[in-house]
């Protein structure tokens, strides 16, 4: 199998960019607690038991000992400075007063002492680091869930102006809170049997919808109607004004996406762009926030009801096994900043705890040298492109709390790598994924960016969503919803995936892990083809060659055989020839790293490639070697340059000296096809004169397993004909 796809651009810019932001050593200057007594204290004290004091506990300096008794609580100075007689006297007082003063009073006195040092209306608490990684410390310590902070608000339930009446037509009620158990059982049986019925429809802007429903018998199903603005949605009262301001209206395909999302259907959207990313982000943030607030308010109201009702038989099921309800998977820290900014603008809290720390560790300015880079590149890699992160958000009536421990969080935002590192530890006893047991909305944004990292991490996370927890974590099972207890949470969970293009990996995720009883929708565009968008001052002959492959497992071997027998001989003859028509300046674009290694080794060892001078650039090539290969290729010292798709994804080089392009395989991203073909226009000498222009050409190799790629490059209609054509296997475009 290929080497693991490392963190985003970490293999290229980890030393230059990662060292001063993200998870680098920028935070290493903080003092660390070195005593075992601190760990003991953190074990005893749950983070949420006294959340109002949490910030002050975290700001205790490394030189202060955690209080263990009355003496330390009342006298924060060092014990070594006290006379022995005074210590004995205080010890006697401690014994005499042991029964008269409860333990929590000692803790409160200590915290009150610290509060006198901090008097800020909007406190931004910095968490002290231990010897553990700071994110690990934040997310996994004090796992016992606590509802004490919610209980503090029980008395306020019903007093706020933003209280909502329960609406039986609200999808939150029909899908999450009070679903029809009989109907759920029926649909789950259909799903487990693989009985999906597809409804296909054409949408606005040449989009097509494939809506799969778990109903083979042909019941009364209809595609949710498009919505034009947020007034048509069932929103929390407090979100209505901010939603109207932030999202005045839904335009184009967003109208259909919004109706499906707020109907709790699964959605796979295959046309995410830099131009529509912000509106999609606001839409998904609004939905996630609306869901969290409705869930938490229902719990608080029922807490108040239980505190007043003396009936012991009352049953209120309003919770999952653990608190986190929304999981948002993102490619980079900067993407996390954008998502959280969208959430905070919609929520408009009075306080944001740890906001400063969050911005220091996650936010960064764009690289000024990237102004010439494409929009999609700057959208993905702009700012802090570190892909190792995880953070929890907790919501109260007036506050957003950053870096809340996962078991006390409402929303978890993480990269696949950041989340897997705490789920899949070497020590099995330390592995933990119970915090994913009650996820009700899973959002994967910019999935095509995650594909270039390591898609296996995404699959691993989805395999561990909504599993029965191994421990109780303070769960009140009398409040757990029935469909959780019946192990049907995966069929209730809503999954939303946005991507710039569809791949087999994402299609597999759609088939295997998107199992929603409310149905699942795939929204894809009609493609005109990247070949129509190539900007060259001259026309270039483009030839597409199809080779037959019966089995997917044999496809790499058959592709290599086709390349070495049908393409390489002509290339070997041309590079040794003279004149303008020789094969010098041939760039071979290879999507797969495994195929790249195979072709590189062939050029190095095969007698058939002895006379071909070549260079190679992959995602793992050192910067100096990259520069040398590009320079020698441009000057003609190298006749052939091997170039991988992931190298282009992370670098977006403009390679000069290209006269011939061979696509060993089609790129996943259609933008890459256009950009690589446009290399032919970077050499003015090659364009001079009609004879020189006629020597420029493009050749691409494909099989039936490249259907998605081919559709994006030649267009939806052309691709269908090229895959079905029986009269020939060569197709030329000019």
Curated annotation (Swiss-Prot):
The keyword rRNA-binding does not apply. Gene3D superfamilies: P-loop containing nucleotide triphosphate hydrolases (3.40.50.300). GO terms for molecular function: rRNA binding; U3 snoRNA binding. Residues 1-10, 18-28 have a biased composition (Basic residues). Residues 46-68, 135-152, 160-170 have a biased composition (Acidic residues). Its main location: nucleus. The keyword rRNA processing applies. Residues 112-134 have a biased composition (Basic and acidic residues). GO terms for biological process: maturation of SSU-rRNA from tricistronic rRNA transcript (SSU-rRNA, 5.8S rRNA, LSU-rRNA). GO terms for cellular component: nucleolus; small-subunit processome. Residues 1-186 are annotated as: Disordered. Keywords: Nucleus, Ribonucleoprotein, Ribosome biogenesis, rRNA processing. PANTHER family: ORF PROTEIN-RELATED, U3 SMALL NUCLEOLAR RNA-ASSOCIATED PROTEIN 25 HOMOLOG. This is U3 small nucleolar RNA-associated protein 25. It comes from Talaromyces marneffei (strain ATCC 18224 / CBS 334.59 / QM 7333) (Penicillium marneffei).
């Amino acid at each position: 199998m290929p080497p693991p796809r490392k963190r985003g651009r970490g293999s290229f810019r980890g030393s230059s960019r990662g060292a001063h932001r993200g998870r680098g050593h920028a935070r290493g200057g903080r003092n660390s607690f070195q005593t075992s007594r601190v760990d003991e204290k953190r074990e005893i004290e749950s983070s949420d038991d006294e959340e109002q004091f949490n910030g002050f506990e975290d700001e205790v300096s490394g030189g202060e000992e955690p209080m263990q008794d009355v003496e330390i609580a009342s006298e924060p100075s060092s014990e070594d400075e006290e006379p022995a007689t005074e210590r004995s006297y205080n010890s006697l007082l401690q014994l005499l007063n042991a029964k008269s003063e409860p333990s929590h009073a000692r803790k409160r006195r200590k915290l009150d002492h610290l509060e006198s040092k901090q008097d800020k209306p909007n406190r931004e608490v910095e968490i002290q680091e231990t010897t553990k990684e700071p994110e690990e410390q934040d997310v996994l310590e004090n796992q016992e869930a606590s509802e004490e902070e919610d209980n503090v608000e029980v008395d306020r339930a019903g007093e706020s102006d933003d209280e909502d009446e329960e609406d039986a037509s609200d999808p939150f009620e029909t899908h999450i809170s009070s679903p029809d158990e009989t109907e759920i059982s029926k649909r789950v049986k259909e799903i487990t049997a693989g009985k999906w019925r597809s409804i296909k429809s054409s949408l606005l802007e040449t989009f097509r919808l494939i809506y799969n429903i778990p109903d083979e018998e042909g019941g009364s199903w209809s595609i949710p109607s498009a919505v034009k603005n947020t007034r048509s949605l069932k929103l929390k009262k407090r979100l209505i004004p901010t939603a109207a301001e932030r999202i005045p209206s839904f335009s184009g395909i967003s109208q259909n996406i919004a109706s499906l999302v707020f109907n709790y259907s699964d959605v796979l959207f295959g046309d995410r762009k830099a131009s529509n990313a912000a509106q999609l982000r606001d839409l998904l943030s609004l939905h996630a926030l609306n869901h969290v607030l409705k869930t938490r308010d229902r719990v608080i109201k029922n807490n108040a009801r239980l505190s007043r009702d003396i009936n012991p038989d009352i049953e209120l099921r309003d919770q999952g096994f653990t608190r986190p309800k929304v999981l948002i998977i993102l490619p980079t820290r900067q993407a996390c900043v954008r998502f959280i900014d969208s959430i905070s603008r919609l929520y408009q809290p009075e306080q944001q705890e740890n906001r400063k720390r969050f911005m220091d560790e996650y936010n960064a300015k764009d690289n000024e040298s990237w102004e010439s880079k494409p929009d999609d590149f700057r959208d993905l890699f702009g700012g802090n492109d570190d892909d190792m992160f995880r953070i929890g958000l907790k919501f109260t009536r007036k506050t957003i709390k950053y870096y809340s421990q996962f078991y006390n969080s409402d929303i978890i935002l993480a990269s696949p790598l950041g989340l897997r590192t705490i789920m899949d530890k070497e020590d099995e006893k330390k592995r933990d994924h119970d915090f994913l047991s009650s996820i009700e909305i899973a959002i994967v944004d910019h999935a095509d960016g995650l594909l270039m990292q390591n898609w296996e991490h995404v699959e691993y996370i989805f395999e561990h969503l909504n599993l029965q927890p191994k421990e109780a974590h303070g769960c009140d099972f009398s409040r757990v919803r029935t469909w959780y207890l019946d192990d049907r949470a995966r069929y209730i969970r809503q999954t939303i995936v946005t991507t710039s293009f569809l791949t087999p990996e994402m299609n597999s995720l759609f088939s295997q892990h998107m199992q929603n009883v409310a149905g699942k929708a795939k929204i894809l565009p009609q493609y005109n083809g990247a070949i129509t968008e190539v900007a060259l001052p001259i026309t270039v002959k483009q030839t597409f060659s199809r080779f037959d492959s019966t089995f997917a497992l044999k496809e790499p071997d058959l592709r290599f055989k086709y390349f070495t027998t049908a393409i390489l001989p002509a290339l070997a003859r041309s590079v040794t020839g003279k004149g303008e028509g020789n094969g010098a300046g041939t760039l071979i674009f290879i999507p797969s790293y495994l195929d790249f290694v195979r072709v590189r080794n062939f050029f190095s060892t095969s007698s058939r490639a002895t006379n071909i001078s070549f260079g190679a650039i992959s995602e793992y090539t050192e910067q100096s070697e990259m520069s040398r290969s590009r320079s020698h290729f441009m000057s003609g010292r190298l006749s052939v340059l091997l170039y991988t798709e992931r190298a282009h994804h992370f670098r977006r080089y403009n390679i000069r000296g290209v006269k011939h392009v061979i696509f060993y395989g089609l790129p996943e991203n259609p933008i890459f096809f256009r950009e690589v073909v446009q290399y032919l226009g970077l050499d003015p000498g090659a364009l001079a004169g009609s004879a020189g222009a006629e020597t420029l050409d493009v050749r691409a190799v494909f099989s039936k397993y490249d259907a998605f790629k081919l559709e994006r490059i030649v267009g939806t209609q052309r691709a269908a004909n090229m895959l079905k054509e029986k009269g020939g296997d060569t197709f030329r475009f000019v």
